[in-house]
Amino acid sequence: AEMEKEIIKEQKHNNIDAFIICPAPGSDTKDMLKKQCAKTPYTLIMEDVYSKEGGNSGNPVIGPDYYKIGSELGKELGKKRQKIGVVANWKESKSDQDAIRGLKDSLKDTKSEIDWYCYRKKDQNIYEKVSKKDKVDAIVVLDPHALEELGEQSDEDSYQGADIYGIGSSVKAVVLLD
């Protein structure tokens, strides 16, 4: 939130009309936005700010329907019996929670099941963490950065034959998933 705060202060001096902000994870972002943008309208992109109380912050948010994304992944994975591992960015992220809820809901009436979850911590090598997990048939990666990291390593068959499914928007992620 500290970097966002500096950018917001800098842009206020440029007489901007409004902000479009991709919020940093953490509970301090909500308070920072209230203070820094009290007189300037803003819209959040990708996801709402985190609140320890949970729920919606009341801020306008534009972003993908993560529940539907998770649900669609679940429909695909539920077509055959599979043990699934899930890699996500941050346990408290609403987007990750929604995607996991959609995935679980779609898998309810199938023979597929989620065997483990792996959440990234700051500056953590996600490849090392995932490679220590139990063998699964498929790995669902909800963190675009982790998807790129894991995709780069998949050429070496480092996931014991597991197929990788994921959410990503970069050309690199698309190529690695192909």
Residue ranges and their predicted role:
Residues 1-15, 115-133, 147-149:
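Structural motif
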Residues 68-116:
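An alpha-beta-alpha
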Residues 138, 145-147, 152-178:
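Exported/periplasmic ABC-transporter solute-binding proteins
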Residues 38-39, 105-113, 154-160:
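Short helix-capping segments at alpha-helix termini
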Residues 1, 23, 60, 83-92:
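Short beta-strand segments enriched in small/hydrophobic residues
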Residues 15-24, 42-45, 85-88, 114-115, ...:
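Periplasmic-binding protein-like
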Residues 29-68, 168-178:
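Flexible loop/hinge segments that line or gate small-molecule binding clefts
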Residues 25-28, 48-52, 90-94, 120-123, ...:
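Solvent-exposed loop/turn segments at secondary-structure junctions
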